[in-house]
UniProtKB/Swiss-Prot annotation:
It is an enzyme of class 3 (hydrolase). SUPFAM superfamilies: Ribosomal protein S5 domain 2-like. The gene is rnpA. Pfam families: Ribonuclease_P. One of its GO terms (molecular function) is tRNA binding. InterPro entries: Ribosomal_Su5_D2-typ_SF (IPR020568), Ribsml_uS5_D2-typ_fold_subgr (IPR014721), RNase_P (IPR000100), RNase_P_CS (IPR020539). Its EC number is 3.1.26.5. It catalyses: Endonucleolytic cleavage of RNA, removing 5'-extranucleotides from tRNA precursor. This is Ribonuclease P protein component. One of its GO terms (biological process) is tRNA 5'-leader removal.
Length: 118
């Protein structure tokens, strides 16, 4: 089962805005840029550099795993755009370790989504 089209992020203007955004999540194996959007659902894009992973098979495996984790953990997020950039070494992690990294990212995104106290 693939991620729904409404969760795909493809607009270059949004990519540029995400990269300029001050809201970031850094991990050893990935960087995530995020910001609120006007759509009522979360949207995500995964970027994997050819210089870090030469084989398309590896890049596709990473992309499938990341999308599976996002579908599982981002289900209760609202109105946020996320750009995930994968770094070297991500492929060597176990699936459970990858889930832990994305769980931390999801908690950070829920803080963004939560109403601010007055």
């Amino acid at each position: 089962m693939s991620a729904k089209t409404k969760h795909h992020l493809r607009d270059r203007k949004v990519f540029a805005a995400l990269l300029r955004s001050k809201r970031r999540f850094f991990s050893t194996f990935l960087m995530a840029y995020f910001m609120p959007n006007r759509v009522r659902t979360w949207r995500a894009a995964v970027s994997i550099s050819k210089t870090k992973y030469k084989l398309a098979v590896e890049r596709n495996l990473i992309r499938r795993q990341v999308k599976a984790i996002m579908r599982e953990q981002f289900c209760n997020l609202n109105a946020v755009d996320v750009l995930v950039i994968i770094n070297q070494g991500f492929l060597e992690l176990t699936f459970k370790e990858k889930q832990t990294i994305f769980l931390n990212l999801c908690q950070k995104l829920q803080e963004l989504d939560a109403p601010k106290p007055k």
